[in-house]
Structures are given as C-alpha cells and as structure tokens.
Design a protein with these regions (language model features):
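Electropositive, beta-rich accessory/interaction domains or terminal extensions
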Residues: 1-126, 132, 168-215
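Short hydrophobic beta/alpha edge segments that flank linear recognition/processing sites
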Residues: 161-164
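A mid-sequence, solvent-exposed acidic-amphipathic segment
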Residues: 131-151
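A short pocket-lining beta-strand/turn micro-motif at the edge of beta-sheets
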Residues: 31, 143-145, 157-159
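Loop/turn positions that initiate beta-strands
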Residues: 102, 152, 157-158
Length: 215
C-alpha cells in the first residue's frame, strides 16, 4: 500500500486574529526535506504543549477532505492547495478510516508511526474564518493524525508514503477518535480498556481512556 506525497510543508510562528501565535500557516517545501525525531527541520510550533514533541512530530491531513470543506467555507482561497490545516504531510487516497494507530510508513527514507488522531482546535477555524469548523471536524471525523518519527531521514514531494507494518488493523484513527474525542466513550468500555494499555497510542490519549473508564 503506497500513496504519492502531494506536498511536505512547514511554517513559522505568526499571530492569529486573537493575537496568539501559531505556525498553522504551513507552506510547501521544494527539494529534499530533512526529517528529524521532532519533525521537519525548520518547522515551528507556538504551542508546544498541544503540538510538536516526539509523539506529534508530523501532522498528516488528507487532501481528500478539502473538497468537503470548500462546500461551506466563507472563503475558499486557502483551500485551493495543501497547508490550510497546519499539516506537514499531504496525500490523497488515505484517510482516518484507512489509517490505523501503530501503522508504520516509509516517508521517503524516514520511518514514521501513527501515534494518534489530531484533535481539532479553534486555530483551524480562525485560519479559515469559520468558527464552526472545529465542531464539524469532530462530528465528521475529518481530523487528520500525527506521526512519531522512528528513524530520521529525508523525503520530498513526489516520493511515496509506503505502509510497512500494521500491528493493529482493527484500530483505525477514526474509531479511536470517535471513542476519545467524538463522544462515543460510553458505548464500548472494552475498547477503552484496550486503548488504555495500547503502547503505540500517545500517552495523553491512553490517560484519557483511563479517565473515561474511571468516570
């Protein structure tokens, strides 16, 4: 299973409408891109509590979703090319229903592993001047996901993202997102128990599963 890389992207911290800084405005990179343990070399994160770090080194958002958001966006200018959602990796043909937690991919020469789905936040709505967008992303499960970098390397647009290992084929990013973010945590306690001990899942989400079990 392989997917052509449409774009690799990085950004610098800039102020949003509320004055808070964010590097959500990613720009496509040309040529070979260096990927380290903390993501693309030169990419920035303003909020390093909720973004970045080893477990959120790279954000992948499917370009397939752009057509859906063009339907309701007040201004579609930013939706004509990848980068509107702060993603570092853009592809087509792979989404939250077909990627699984723990999947390992070759991204160029780097090896990356899916660590969690992304939790939408107000900054995506702010960037597109669409306050309801984060809520819609949760409702529809169009969240994107994060990778941790297992082996640093380099990649460029036009390379392939190649699936190398899938240890948890039943645990799609969408299924885990719906349980831990989308409000379905009361429907399957056995699933929560499994997620609470799933070592490849981001520790913060394992803790969330435990909290739901204890609640």
């Amino acid at each position: 299973m392989f997917f052509p890389i449409r774009a690799l992207l990085a950004g610098r911290v800039q102020p949003l409408s509320r004055g808070e800084g964010s590097a959500i405005a990613k720009q496509p990179l040309s040529g070979a891109v260096q990927i380290g343990l903390f993501g693309i070399i030169g990419d920035e994160q303003a909020d390093q509590v909720h973004h970045g770090g080893r477990d959120k080194a790279l954000h992948h958002y499917p370009f397939d979703h752009y057509a859906r958001w063009q339907e309701g966006a007040p201004d579609t200018a930013l939706l004509s090319a990848a980068g509107a959602f702060g993603e570092n990796v853009s592809t087509t043909g792979l989404d939250e229903d077909t990627v699984c937690i723990g999947d390992r991919f070759r991204l160029g020469s780097a090896l990356v592993e899916v660590s969690q789905a992304r939790q939408p936040c107000w900054k995506q709505g702010d960037r597109l001047a669409w306050a309801d967008l984060p809520k819609l992303m949760v409702q529809e499960g169009r969240s994107g996901w994060y990778y941790r970098v297992i082996e640093p390397g380099q990649a460029q647009a036009g390379d392939e993202l190649v699936l190398k290992d899938r240890p948890f084929p039943d645990w799609t990013a969408r299924r885990v997102f719906d349980l831990l973010v989308g409000g379905k945590h009361k429907e399957d306690r056995a699933a929560l128990a499994f997620l609470s001990d799933m070592d490849v899942l981001f520790e913060g989400w394992r803790m969330r599963a435990r909290q739901f079990l204890d609640g």
